């Protein structure tokens, strides 16, 4: 039986799509003599580059089916297949085969949100996130960035990954927020008291990533997680020597510096891990997906490879930690949570891309919230990115703004009393969009449980 071929006229590389629906698995194609995936002829200049070795292995899994186009936010908005996963795959393919990349190549790769929705959709298991990271790094080595971009990136790299630098700026902004133009003031959350952090008292201990911007912008998130887990018999321990997870530098093509940050975090946490810490918690799903990738990022490091792999395996998102500990919650306190949840009103939940696509935890947080008695509204296209995507909203404001508007409209369509999410970037980005039309608070979902344990209603100022 021969595969049916359809030409993909919108893509500029003369690709033929082969729809292999008669095969039980895409991988079975090779058994029928059909070459599986994108075939490459690596240029001699890249023959010893480990990044290109990984790129080639990933490319071989892609069967050109085009299913990723249907779930790619930038392709949906722009309609250009070069701004789709398949289009970017073939641009990267051309680069590793020796074709000189251009400014246009860089622009199409930059427009990728790295939301990894395509990975969830892909039937072949293409690890597109690793592919785009390596592809961008290769292209940037050969295409010069503009001065304005370099200045903006330099400022972000100087500030964002360092909480000792970002916190004073945030406090200053909060102090003068009232006299700022509204469009700027909306981007600065109101200062709030995070509340007490329970003293470690349980045999079960879990480490927590403080992060870089979260202590300054949403300090209540980790404090709320500490109180909820304390009620469930788990002590949350912060190790001050640990810093940024490395995601900011890694995705801004400063991979070597990012790897150093990963090593520093491993060194900071390792004594506690050896003492029996049961896991590492990342309340921001964007940080969590980076921590879970330490094993891959440091796989070739002879000193840190094993430690990085173990740390990745120990890393938990908030929902994984709470779900595993919830059975230890006292029945009376559980009843208090359910009573508060029933009175909370409808909740709209936005699952961050890093949670549902990066960590493959789609639907898990929603299931936990429903189990505790919360009513969740229906949100159309919940699989799509809100447009935050780390620093994407800074470098691609037009696309980011359109995605933000679409997401806010979808979240508000069910008239929720509160909007919840699981990542600081999404929380702030959606909060800025919501603030333009309503006063619905946007919070991390763990704050709902924290308030419910205290017998309080949902809502409040934490999302601003």
List the predicted regions and their residue ranges.
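Iron-sulfur cluster-binding electron-transfer modules in prokaryotic oxidoreductases
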Residues: 128-464
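Cysteine-centered iron-sulfur cluster-binding motifs in ferredoxin-type domains/subunits
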Residues: 56-75, 102, 106-126, 354, ...
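Non-heme iron-sulfur electron-transfer modules
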Residues: 35-47, 51, 75-107, 125-154, ...
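Acidic, Ala/Val/Gly-enriched low-complexity intrinsically disordered segments
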Residues: 7, 28-30
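Short hydrophobic transmembrane-like helices used for membrane targeting/insertion
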Residues: 1-4, 15
């Amino acid at each position: 039986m021969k595969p049916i071929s359809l030409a993909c006229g919108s893509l500029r590389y003369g690709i033929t799509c082969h729809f292999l629906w008669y095969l039980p698995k895409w991988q079975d194609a090779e058994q029928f003599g059909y070459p599986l995936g994108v075939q490459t002829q690596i240029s001699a200049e890249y023959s010893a580059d480990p990044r290109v070795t990984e790129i080639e292995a990933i490319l071989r899994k892609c069967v050109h089916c085009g299913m990723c186009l249907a779930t790619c936010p930038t392709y949906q908005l722009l309609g250009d297949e070069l701004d789709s996963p398949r289009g970017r795959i073939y641009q990267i393919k051309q680069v590793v085969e020796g074709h000189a990349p251009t400014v246009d190549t860089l622009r199409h790769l930059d427009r990728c949100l790295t939301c990894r929705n395509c990975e969830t959709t892909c039937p072949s298991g293409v690890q597109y996130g690793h592919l785009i990271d390596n592809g961008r790094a290769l292209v940037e080595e050969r295409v010069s960035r503009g001065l304005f971009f370099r200045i903006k990136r330099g400022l972000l790299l100087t500030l964002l990954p360092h909480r000792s630098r970002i916190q004073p700026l945030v406090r200053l902004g909060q102090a003068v927020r009232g006299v700022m133009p509204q469009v700027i003031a909306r981007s600065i959350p109101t200062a709030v008291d995070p509340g007490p952090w329970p003293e470690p008292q349980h045999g079960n201990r879990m480490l927590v990533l403080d992060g870089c911007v979260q202590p300054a912008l949403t300090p209540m998130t980790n404090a709320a997680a500490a109180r909820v887990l304390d009620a469930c018999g788990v002590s949350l321990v912060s190790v001050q020597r640990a810093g940024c997870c490395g995601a900011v530098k890694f995705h801004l093509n400063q991979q070597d510096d990012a790897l150093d940050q990963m090593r520093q975090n491993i060194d900071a946490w390792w004594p506690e891990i050896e003492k029996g810490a049961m896991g590492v918690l990342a309340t921001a799903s964007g940080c969590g997906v980076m921590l879970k990738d330490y094993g891959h990022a440091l796989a070739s490091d002879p000193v840190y490879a094993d430690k990085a792999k173990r740390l990745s395996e120990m890393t938990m998102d908030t929902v994984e930690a709470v779900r595993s500990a919830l059975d230890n919650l006292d029945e009376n306190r559980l009843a208090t949570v359910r009573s508060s949840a029933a009175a909370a009103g409808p909740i709209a939940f936005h699952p961050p891309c890093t949670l549902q696509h990066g960590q493959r935890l789609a639907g898990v947080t929603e299931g936990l919230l429903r189990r505790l008695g919360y009513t969740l509204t229906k949100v159309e296209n919940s699989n799509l990115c809100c447009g935050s995507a780390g620093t994407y909203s800074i470098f691609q404001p037009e696309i980011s703004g359109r995605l933000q508007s679409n997401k806010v409209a979808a979240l508000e369509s069910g008239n929720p009393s509160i909007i919840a999410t699981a990542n600081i970037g999404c929380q702030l980005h959606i909060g800025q969009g919501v603030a333009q039309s309503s006063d619905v608070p946007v919070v991390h979902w763990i704050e709902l449980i924290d308030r419910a344990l205290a017998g309080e209603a949902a809502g409040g100022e934490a999302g601003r």
